[in-house]
Amino acid sequence: LKKKVSLPDVIYGETRIVDAEGRSLGMRRLKAPEKLTWKSFRMGMLVCHQSFISKREIAPLYNTEYRLTADYDWCIQCLRRSKRIHNTRLILSNFLEEGLSSVNRKASLKERYEVMCKYYGKVSTILLHGWFAVRFYFAKWFKGRV
C-alpha cells in the first residue's frame, strides 16, 4: 500500500526588507521563531503574512473590519486551525520597508491591540504592550533600528 504524504497546514519562513528599488536592506528585525503556534503571536507579528503559507482548507477569509491588521488576525486563525506547522528556515518574501501599517503605525497598533484582546485577553494584552514598548525603544536606542 502506498502511504499518503500529508503536507503541513502552515509553512512559514523569513522575510528580507527591501527599499522601493528592491535593494536589500537586511533581514526583518523579528526573526521567525523555530516553532510557531497561535500563542506565539502574543509577541506581535512574528512572521510576515507574505512569508506565511496556509492550506486553503484551514484559511478563513480576511476580516475586512480590520483595515490594517487583517493579516495578523488571519495568521492567528490559520494557526489555531492547523495541526502541522513547518519552518522552512528560508527567505520566502521581500517586504517593502514602508508598508501600509508602517505608515499608519498608530492606527495599526490600535487595531492589533483589539485583535490581541480578542484572542489573548485584555490583562495579558496590556502587560504584553508594556514589553513591546521596552523592546521597541531598546532596538531604537541601542541597535539603531525599528
Predicted regions, residues:
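Conserved nucleotide-sugar donor-binding catalytic segment
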Residues: 13, 19, 26-107, 111
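Membrane-proximal basic amphipathic "stem/tether" segments
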Residues: 117-146
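A short coil-to-beta-strand element that immediately follows conserved catalytic motifs
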Residues: 9-11, 88-90, 124-128
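Basic side chains
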Residues: 55-56, 112, 135, 140
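Conserved donor NDP-sugar-binding/catalytic core segment of glycosyltransferases
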Residues: 1-25
